[in-house]
C-alpha cells in the first residue's frame, strides 16, 4: 500500500518536523491548518463541562431537569455520530478539503445559535450543529494531514492533530475560567468557538485538496504539483511512482477505480483486518474513560472535596494542560518508539492511575465528615428534612446528607476546619449564601477530604499516560492502515464507532453514588438511556 506505516530511521521524526519550519513550511501550513479541526473537536469536548455550570444558573428548567442537562451534552455527541458516518462517505465522494469546509460552516452556525439561545431548546439545536461539524472534522483532519505528509514524519504530523485536540481542551478551560465573572458567562464560552471555525474555513479555501485523493480521482497532474511541494526533490518521483502503482493495483483487482460499496469493502481481507484494528482502537479509547474524565473533570474535582466552581475549573485547567503536554510527547515518540509500544506503555499507566483514583474515591466516600446536630441547629428552619426525620441521624455523615433527595440537601462545613462535623441543610442559593457568610464551605457534589490532593495526582497520572498513546495512536492508525480507495469510508466507520462508544459511556445525570462506583471500577453503566429513579442534580457551589 502506498504511503504505508513508515519504519523510523535513526533521525528523530520530531527533529524532522522542526526542521520543516525553515526547510519546507508549506507542509506545516497544511498540517496545522487542517489540524484546527482537531482544535474545534477538543474545544467542544472541554467547554461544555464549565459552561453547563452557568447554563443551569440562567435556565432553571435545565437545573431542575436532568434530561435537559443530558441532552445539552449528548446531542452534540449524537450529531458527531451522524457527522462522522456521513463524513466518511463525503470524504471519498467530494474530497477531504470540501468536507472540512462544510464542517467549519456547521460548527460556526452551531456556535452562533448556542451563544444567542434564549432557552434550552435552541441551545440543544446549536449543540446538534456543532456535533455534526465536530464529527466530520474528527475523522477528516487526521486523514488530510496523513495524505499531505511525507511518509517518514507522517506519525509526528498527524500527532499535531492530537496536540490541537488537547490544546483545544486546554483553551476551553482557560476561556471558561476567564469568563466566570463576565456578564453572559456561558454565552461567551460557547460562542468563542466560532472564531477558529471561521479561521479554518478561510485557510482551507487557500489550500489544495489531498494529493492522494486527487490522484485517485484521475487528476494526476494536479496531484503531482502538490506532491512536489511536499516531498524533497530526490524523493518525490519515487512517491509518485508508488502512488501510481497502488492505484493501478486497486483498479486491476476490483475492476473499477470508482465503484465502491460496503459489500466490496468487507470482502477485501486487508480492509476487514484494518477495520477490526481501527474500530477496536477507537472503541477502546472511549471505554478507558477519557471523555468522561474531560467532560466531567470539574465535577470529579468537586467529588474529591474541592467545593468551589472556580477552584474546580482552575484545577481542570491543569488537567487539560497535562493532556496537551502528553500530545507533545506523542509527537516526539510516535515515529521513533512505534505505535504498539506506545499503546502498551499508555494502557499500563492508565490502569495504575485509575487504581489510584478508585482508592481515593473509596476513601472519600467512606470517611467523610460527620453531621453535627449542634452545627445543624445553628441554622434555623433550614435543616434537611430527611436528616430531621431520620432515626439514625447520629450516624449521618456528609455523603449521607448529599444523597438525601426530599428535597436535595447540602453540607455546610465547620468554620474552623472543613474536616470537622458540619451541618446538613436544604440545598438552595439562599442557604448557600448563608453558609458562605460565616466563612464556611458549601458542598453539594463531593465532601471535604484530606485525600483530595491524591485525586488530583490520580487525574494527572491518568492524563499523562493516556494522551501520548491511547489519545493519539487510534487517530493516527486510522489515517494510515486502509487502502487509499477505502480510506475515507473506513475512517468514517471507525470515527463513528468512537462517537457511539462515547455516547454509551456517557454518565451525565447519574446519581453521585453511581458516578463514584464507575470511577471505582465497580459498575459500568452501558444503558445510559435507563435513568431509573434518579434525584435531580444539585447546584454546584461557587
Give the residues covered by each predicted segment.
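Alpha-helical transmembrane bundle of multi-pass membrane proteins
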Residues: 1-231, 250-542
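Short intracellular "coupling" helices and adjacent cytoplasmic loop segments at the cytosolic face
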Residues: 229-239, 245, 252
Amino acid at each position: 500500500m502506498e504511503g504505508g506505516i513508515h519504519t523510523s530511521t535513526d533521525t528523530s521524526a520530531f527533529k524532522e518536523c522542526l526542521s520543516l519550519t525553515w526547510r519546507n513550511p508549506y507542509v506545516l501550513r497544511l498540517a496545522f491548518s487542517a489540524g484546527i479541526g482537531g482544535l474545534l473537536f477538543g474545544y467542544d469536548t472541554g467547554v461544555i463541562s464549565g459552561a453547563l455550570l452557568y447554563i443551569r444558573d440562567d435556565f432553571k428548567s435545565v437545573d431542575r431537569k436532568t434530561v435537559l442537562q443530558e441532552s445539552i451534552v449528548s446531542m452534540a455527541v449524537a450529531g458527531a455520530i451522524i457527522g462522522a458516518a456521513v463524513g466518511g462517505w463525503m470524504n471519498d465522494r467530494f474530497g477531504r478539503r470540501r468536507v472540512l469546509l462544510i464542517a467549519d460552516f456547521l460548527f460556526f452556525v452551531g456556535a452562533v445559535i448556542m451563544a444567542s439561545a434564549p432557552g434550552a431548546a435552541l441551545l440543544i439545536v446549536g449543540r446538534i450543529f456543532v456535533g455534526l461539524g465536530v464529527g466530520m472534522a474528527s475523522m477528516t483532519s487526521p486523514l488530510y494531514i496523513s495524505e499531505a505528509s511525507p511518509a517518514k514524519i507522517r506519525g509526528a504530523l498527524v500527532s499535531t492533530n492530537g496536540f490541537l485536540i488537547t490544546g483545544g481542551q486546554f483553551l476551553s478551560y482557560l476561556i471558561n475560567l476567564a469568563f466566570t465573572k463576565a456578564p453572559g458567562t456561558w454565552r461567551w464560552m460557547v460562542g468563542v468557538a466560532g472564531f477558529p471555525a471561521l479561521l479554518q474555513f478561510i485557510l482551507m479555501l487557500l489550500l489544495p485538496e489531498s494529493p492522494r485523493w486527487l490522484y485517485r480521482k484521475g487528476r494526476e497532474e494536479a496531484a503531482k504539483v502538490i506532491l512536489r511541494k511536499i516531498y524533497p526533490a530526490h524523493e518525490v518521483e519515487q512517491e509518485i511512482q508508488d502512488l501510481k502503482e497502488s492505484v493501478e493495483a486497486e483498479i486491476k483487482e476490483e475492476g473499477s477505480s470508482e465503484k465502491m460499496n460496503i459489500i466490496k469493502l468487507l470482502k477485501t481481507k486487508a480492509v476487514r483486518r484494518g477495520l477490526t484494528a481501527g474500530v477496536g482502537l477507537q472503541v477502546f479509547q472511549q471505554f478507558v474513560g477519557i471523555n468522561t474524565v474531560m467532560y466531567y473533570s470539574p465535577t470529579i474535582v468537586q467529588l474529591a472535596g474541592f467545593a468551589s466552581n472556580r477552584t474546580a475549573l482552575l484545577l481542570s485547567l491543569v488537567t487539560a494542560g497535562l493532556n496537551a503536554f502528553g500530545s507533545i510527547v506523542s509527537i516526539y515518540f510516535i515515529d521513533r518508539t512505534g505505535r504498539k509500544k506506545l499503546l502498551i506503555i499508555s494502557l499500563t499507566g492508565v490502569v495504575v492511575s485509575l487504581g489510584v483514583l478508585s482508592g481515593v474515591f473509596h476513601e472519600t466516600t467512606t470517611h467523610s465528615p460527620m453531621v453535627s446536630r449542634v452545627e445543624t441547629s445553628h441554622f434555623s428552619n433550614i435543616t434537611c428534612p430527611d436528616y430531621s426525620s431520620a432515626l439514625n441521624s447520629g450516624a449521618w455523615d456528609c455523603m449521607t446528607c448529599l444523597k438525601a433527595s426530599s428535597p436535595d440537601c447540602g453540607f455546610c462545613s465547620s468554620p474552623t476546619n472543613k474536616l470537622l462535623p458540619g451541618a446538613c441543610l436544604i440545598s438552595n442559593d439562599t442557604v448557600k449564601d448563608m453558609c458562605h457568610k460565616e466563612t464556611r464551605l458549601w458542598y453539594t457534589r463531593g465532601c471535604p477530604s484530606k485525600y483530595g490532593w491524591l485525586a488530583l495526582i490520580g487525574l494527572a497520572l491518568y492524563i499523562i499516560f493516556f494522551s501520548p498513546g491511547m489519545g493519539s495512536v487510534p487517530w493516527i492508525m486510522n489515517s494510515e492502515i486502509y487502502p487509499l480507495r477505502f480510506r475515507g469510508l473506513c475512517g468514517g466507520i471507525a470515527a463513528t464507532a468512537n462517537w457511539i462508544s462515547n455516547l454509551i459511556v456517557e454518565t451525565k445525570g447519574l446519581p453521585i453514588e453511581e458516578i463514584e462506583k464507575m470511577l471505582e471500577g465497580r459498575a459500568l453503566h452501558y444503558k445510559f438511556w435507563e435513568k431509573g429513579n434518579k434525584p435531580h442534580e444539585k447546584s454546584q457551589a461557587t
